[in-house]
A protein has these predicted regions:
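Sec-dependent bacterial lipoprotein signal peptides
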Residues: 1-20
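Short, low-complexity intrinsically disordered segments
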Residues: 1-2, 29, 131
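N-terminal helix-cap/turn-to-beta initiation motif at the start of protein domains
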Residues: 17-32, 123-124
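Edge beta-strand at a domain terminus
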Residues: 57-63, 103-135
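Contiguous, well-ordered beta-strand patches that form the walls/edges
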Residues: 35-42, 55-108
Protein backbone atom coordinates (compact mmCIF):
# COMPACT_ATOMS: atom_id res chain seq x y z
CA UNK A 1 0.00 0.00 0.00
CA UNK A 2 2.80 2.44 0.88
CA UNK A 3 4.60 1.62 -2.35
CA UNK A 4 1.42 2.33 -4.35
CA UNK A 5 0.90 5.70 -2.60
CA UNK A 6 4.54 6.62 -3.12
CA UNK A 7 4.22 5.80 -6.83
CA UNK A 8 1.05 7.86 -7.12
CA UNK A 9 2.70 10.79 -5.35
CA UNK A 10 5.72 10.60 -7.68
CA UNK A 11 3.41 10.54 -10.72
CA UNK A 12 1.47 13.57 -9.48
CA UNK A 13 4.72 15.47 -8.89
CA UNK A 14 5.91 14.73 -12.43
CA UNK A 15 2.58 15.78 -13.96
CA UNK A 16 2.56 19.05 -12.02
CA UNK A 17 6.17 19.77 -13.02
CA UNK A 18 5.38 19.23 -16.70
CA UNK A 19 2.31 21.46 -16.41
CA UNK A 20 4.34 24.23 -14.80
CA UNK A 21 7.11 24.25 -17.39
CA UNK A 22 6.84 27.30 -19.63
CA UNK A 23 6.18 26.16 -23.18
CA UNK A 24 7.92 27.94 -26.01
CA UNK A 25 5.83 29.77 -28.56
CA UNK A 26 5.25 27.83 -31.75
CA UNK A 27 6.06 29.12 -35.21
CA UNK A 28 3.82 26.67 -37.00
CA UNK A 29 0.50 27.86 -38.27
CA UNK A 30 -0.88 30.96 -39.93
CA UNK A 31 0.24 34.44 -38.93
CA UNK A 32 -1.21 37.81 -39.93
CA UNK A 33 1.66 40.00 -41.13
CA UNK A 34 2.34 43.55 -42.24
CA UNK A 35 5.47 45.03 -43.82
CA UNK A 36 6.92 48.57 -43.72
CA UNK A 37 4.80 49.60 -46.72
CA UNK A 38 1.71 48.66 -44.67
CA UNK A 39 1.00 45.75 -47.03
CA UNK A 40 -0.81 42.87 -45.34
CA UNK A 41 0.20 39.24 -45.81
CA UNK A 42 -0.62 35.80 -44.54
CA UNK A 43 2.53 33.94 -43.49
CA UNK A 44 2.11 30.21 -42.93
CA UNK A 45 4.86 28.18 -41.27
CA UNK A 46 4.81 24.44 -41.84
CA UNK A 47 7.41 21.88 -40.82
CA UNK A 48 9.94 22.73 -43.56
CA UNK A 49 8.18 25.33 -45.72
CA UNK A 50 7.07 28.87 -45.15
CA UNK A 51 4.52 30.59 -47.38
CA UNK A 52 4.69 34.38 -47.53
CA UNK A 53 1.74 35.68 -49.49
CA UNK A 54 1.65 33.38 -52.53
CA UNK A 55 5.36 32.43 -52.48
CA UNK A 56 6.63 29.19 -50.90
CA UNK A 57 10.15 28.87 -49.49
CA UNK A 58 12.06 25.95 -47.99
CA UNK A 59 13.55 26.69 -44.61
CA UNK A 60 15.29 25.15 -41.65
CA UNK A 61 14.76 26.31 -38.10
CA UNK A 62 17.04 26.40 -35.10
CA UNK A 63 15.22 26.94 -31.85
CA UNK A 64 13.48 27.90 -29.80
CA UNK A 65 16.35 29.75 -28.19
CA UNK A 66 16.36 32.48 -25.58
CA UNK A 67 18.40 35.60 -25.03
CA UNK A 68 17.82 38.26 -22.39
CA UNK A 69 14.66 36.39 -21.32
CA UNK A 70 13.17 36.57 -24.85
CA UNK A 71 12.36 33.62 -27.09
CA UNK A 72 13.39 33.51 -30.74
CA UNK A 73 13.87 31.12 -33.66
CA UNK A 74 16.71 31.37 -36.18
CA UNK A 75 15.64 30.53 -39.72
CA UNK A 76 17.62 29.72 -42.85
CA UNK A 77 15.43 30.36 -45.89
CA UNK A 78 16.46 28.93 -49.25
CA UNK A 79 15.45 30.77 -52.42
CA UNK A 80 16.96 30.16 -55.86
CA UNK A 81 20.05 28.50 -54.42
CA UNK A 82 20.72 31.33 -51.96
CA UNK A 83 20.36 30.88 -48.19
CA UNK A 84 19.40 33.88 -46.07
CA UNK A 85 19.21 34.09 -42.26
CA UNK A 86 16.15 35.48 -40.50
CA UNK A 87 14.90 35.58 -36.94
CA UNK A 88 11.37 35.28 -35.58
CA UNK A 89 11.51 37.07 -32.24
CA UNK A 90 8.86 37.05 -29.51
CA UNK A 91 9.24 40.45 -27.75
CA UNK A 92 6.78 39.64 -24.94
CA UNK A 93 5.59 36.58 -23.04
CA UNK A 94 2.67 36.39 -25.48
CA UNK A 95 2.77 33.60 -28.02
CA UNK A 96 0.62 35.63 -30.42
CA UNK A 97 2.98 38.55 -31.13
CA UNK A 98 6.27 38.22 -33.02
CA UNK A 99 8.71 40.17 -35.17
CA UNK A 100 10.23 38.79 -38.38
CA UNK A 101 13.76 40.21 -38.54
CA UNK A 102 16.71 40.11 -40.90
CA UNK A 103 19.67 40.22 -38.48
CA UNK A 104 22.64 42.45 -39.28
CA UNK A 105 24.96 39.89 -37.69
CA UNK A 106 24.34 36.19 -37.03
CA UNK A 107 25.98 36.64 -33.62
CA UNK A 108 23.22 39.12 -32.68
CA UNK A 109 20.10 37.37 -34.01
CA UNK A 110 17.56 39.66 -32.31
CA UNK A 111 19.03 42.88 -33.71
CA UNK A 112 18.41 43.90 -37.29
CA UNK A 113 15.86 45.12 -39.80
CA UNK A 114 12.25 44.24 -39.06
CA UNK A 115 10.63 42.89 -42.22
CA UNK A 116 7.22 41.95 -40.84
CA UNK A 117 5.10 42.49 -37.76
CA UNK A 118 3.39 39.18 -36.94
CA UNK A 119 0.26 38.38 -34.95
CA UNK A 120 -1.57 35.06 -34.63
CA UNK A 121 -4.99 36.55 -33.84
CA UNK A 122 -5.33 39.97 -35.47
CA UNK A 123 -3.86 42.20 -38.15
CA UNK A 124 -0.71 43.85 -36.77
CA UNK A 125 0.37 47.43 -37.39
CA UNK A 126 4.03 47.49 -38.48
CA UNK A 127 4.88 50.95 -37.13
CA UNK A 128 3.18 50.47 -33.77
CA UNK A 129 5.24 47.27 -33.36
CA UNK A 130 8.42 49.18 -34.25
CA UNK A 131 7.61 51.86 -31.70
CA UNK A 132 6.58 49.40 -28.99
CA UNK A 133 9.10 46.56 -29.37
CA UNK A 134 12.22 47.87 -31.12
CA UNK A 135 14.17 50.10 -28.79
Amino acid sequence: MKRWLLGLLALLCMVSMVACIKSAPSLEGEWHAQDALKKDYAIVFKKDKVKIGEQDYNYTVDGPKSKDDFTYYSLKVKDQGKETSYTVFFPTKSKEVALFLEPNDEKEPIKGQMLFALNKKEKPDYYSYVKKYLK
